[in-house]
A protein has these predicted regions:
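Immediate post-signal peptide segment of exported/extracytoplasmic ligand-binding proteins
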Residues: 27-52, 130, 135-141, 278-289
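Extracytoplasmic small-molecule ligand-binding "clamshell" domains
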Residues: 29-100, 108, 257, 261
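Periplasmic-binding protein-like
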Residues: 42-44, 117-125, 198-239, 264-283
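Extended ligand-binding regions for polar small-molecule ligands
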Residues: 60-69, 128, 135-136, 140-141, ...
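A conserved helix-loop-strand patch within extracytoplasmic ligand-binding domains
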Residues: 72, 101, 114-159
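Ligand-binding clefts/hinges and TM-proximal coupling segments of bilobed small-molecule sensing domains
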Residues: 73, 152-165, 202-206, 236-284
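Short helix-initiation/N-cap motifs at beta->coil->alpha
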Residues: 75-86, 129, 163-179
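A ligand-binding cleft/hinge motif common to bilobed small-molecule-binding domains
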Residues: 83-86, 98-108, 153-156, 181-219
Length: 289
């Protein structure tokens, strides 16, 4: 073989090796369908949706980006929220997403990712008020959604009257009509709705309290993805990409598209309940200013 032939062969071989290395993550990772990341989601915005063959929503965009970095194709699996966790446990899907908050109980049945954003519960109210504390709600009529875990804590606030609703829409309608004074709902959902309906003249304030007697209302929440416990390699690969998105502040850019602009979503303030549970005691929460 002459010199030019050797050079061409060497170039082709180098190109082939680069292609194989670029594709390596997809083949190295154990997924339900080889080469794909199967995602269980409910389609509730601003967390997840599927449009134009791509995941959308805050959680959805993050997984879409991470899938690309890992060399995996996204395979959507739309289902009711109640079925997402069970699908992960049964390994019918690789991951579930949809503004799921970390809890110790969930950490026992799934492997939970590093946080993709934070949240604190708070008060949705009209522009006539600027309430930020539990004390501000004393003696007020406040709506929330049936089944929320913090309802018993709401009932402990002196003089507060709890009004239960089946949906966030119903609660907001009564707030706009003046039948209740405020709403304590799902923070990302409320913020997203407010950002898309300026004519409501509503705003959301996260609780500034950090009261150990009201941990669910005032504590630090972490939104995470859920994985099967028998697939630590996939979890580690996704966590590595989550950390990159934090370091580049891409999290804030994605959040801005869905109304999540306040520091509370991206700067952890409060006790990290994961320490010594599913994270080492010296683990540090990521953030972006």
């Amino acid at each position: 073989m002459n010199k030019s032939g050797i050079q061409r062969f060497t170039g082709l071989w180098a190109g082939l090796m680069l292609s194989l290395l670029a594709a390596a993550p997809a083949f190295a990772l154990d997924t339900v369908e080889p080469g794909s990341l199967t995602i269980a989601f409910s389609g509730d915005m601003p967390g997840t949706g599927y449009q134009d063959s791509k995941m959308v929503g805050y959680d959805g965009e993050i997984l879409q980006q991470i899938s690309g970095k890992l060399g995996l194709k996204v395979k959507p699996a739309l289902m009711e929220w109640s079925g997402t966790i069970a699908s992960v446990q049964a390994r019918r899907v690789d991951v579930m997403a949809g503004t799921m908050g970390w809890t110790e109980q969930r950490s026992k049945i799934m492997a939970l990712s590093d946080p993709i954003h934070y949240f604190k519960n708070g008060i949705t109210q009209t522009d006539k008020t600027d309430w930020k504390t539990l004390k501000d709600l004393q003696g007020k009529k406040v709506g929330t959604i049936t089944g929320f875990s913090f309802i018993p804590e709401m009932r402990k606030i002196p003089g507060l009257q709890v009004t239960l609703y089946d949906t966030s829409d119903a609660a907001v309608r009564d707030l706009l009509a003046g039948r209740i004074d405020a709403v304590i709902g799902d923070p990302p959902v409320m913020q997203y709705a407010i950002s898309r309906n300026a004519q409501w003249h509503l705003h959301f304030n996260a609780f500034t309290d950090n009261d150990p007697d009201f941990p669910l209302l005032t504590g630090l929440g972490q939104v995470v993805f859920g994985f099967n416990k028998d697939n630590p390699q996939l979890l580690a690969a996704v966590n590595e990409q989550i950390q990159v998105l934090w370091k580049t502040c891409e999290m804030r850019k994605i959040g801005a598209r869905y109304g999540l602009t306040q520091d509370v979503w991206f700067m952890p303030q409060g006790t990290d309940l994961r320490l010594s549970v599913d994270r080492p005691a010296d683990w540090k929460l990521p953030g972006c200013q």
